Swiss-Prot record:
Species the sequence originates in: Xanthomonas oryzae pv. oryzae (strain PXO99A)
Listed name of the protein: NADH-quinone oxidoreductase subunit B
Lineage start: Bacteria, Pseudomonadati, Pseudomonadota, Gammaproteobacteria, Lysobacterales
Keyword hit for Iron-sulfur: yes
InterPro entries (alphabetical): NADH_UbQ_OxRdtase-like_20kDa (IPR006137), NADH_UQ_OxRdtase_20Kd_su (IPR006138)
GO biological process, one term: aerobic respiration
PANTHER family: NADH DEHYDROGENASE, NADH DEHYDROGENASE [UBIQUINONE] IRON-SULFUR PROTEIN 7, MITOCHONDRIAL
Sites where the protein binds [4Fe-4S] cluster: 61-62, 126, 156
Family: Belongs to the complex I 20 kDa subunit family.
Localization terms from the record: Cell inner membrane
Major subcellular site: membrane
Cross-referenced Gene3D superfamilies: 3.40.50.12280
Keyword vocabulary terms for this entry: 4Fe-4S, Cell inner membrane, Cell membrane, Iron, Iron-sulfur, Membrane, Metal-binding, NAD, Quinone, Translocase, Transport, Ubiquinone
Length: 182
């Protein structure tokens, strides 16, 4: 070990090369296979799936079903889902109900205020594609025209159980993502 330290002191490393004291030639099979970054990805995704903090953007009758999902019968707290009042504290936005043209800039503004990484759940037929009011002049035909949507929950209005299923699907999607570039 002392010889390695002497060699490092007398012969500096070439630019761009990292040398490990325990492996002087730089071969590290764990790093080559991506083991360390995979483990950090798994740790981050485990933490993100266990602590999803949605911000509600209830626009119509689907918001009532969202309140049912947060009540004691289904208890979203057991999945680590805690509703937050501020977009700066949340990482999931649940868009529930009819999105009209006047409300679209506000939706985008709230989405932009959320910290990264952020996910969007579109809840109900109106949020997914305009729903019953699809042909109205003032209705946005799907909130995916304003913000990128990760999970679509169908129904008019969807049941609280369907929203819980959508949240569980989002947790699976988060678990599969790779956050660290290799």
């Amino acid at each position: 070990m002392i010889q390695t330290l002497d060699r490092l002191m007398t012969n500096p490393m070439p630019e761009g090369r990292v040398e490990d004291i325990l492996r002087p030639e730089g071969e590290n099979p764990l790093l080559e296979k991506g083991y360390v970054t995979t483990s950090v990805d798994a740790l981050l995704n485990w933490a993100r799936t266990g602590s999803m903090w949605p911000m509600t953007f209830g626009l119509a009758c689907c918001a009532v079903e969202m309140m049912h999902a947060g009540a004691s019968r289904l208890d979203l707290d057991r999945y680590g889902v805690v509703f937050r009042p501020s977009p700066r504290q949340s990482d999931v936005m649940i868009v529930a109900g009819t999105l009209v043209n006047k409300m679209a800039p506000a939706l985008r503004k709230v989405y932009d205020q959320m910290p990264d990484p952020k996910w969007v759940i579109s809840m109900g037929s109106c949020a997914n594609g305009g729903g019953y009011y699809h042909y109205s002049y003032s209705v946005v035909r799907g909130c995916d025209r304003i913000v990128p949507v990760d999970i679509y929950v169908p129904g008019c209005p969807p049941t609280a159980e369907a929203l819980v299923y959508g949240i569980l699907q989002l947790q699976k999607k988060i678990w599969r993502t790779q956050t660290i570039a290799r």
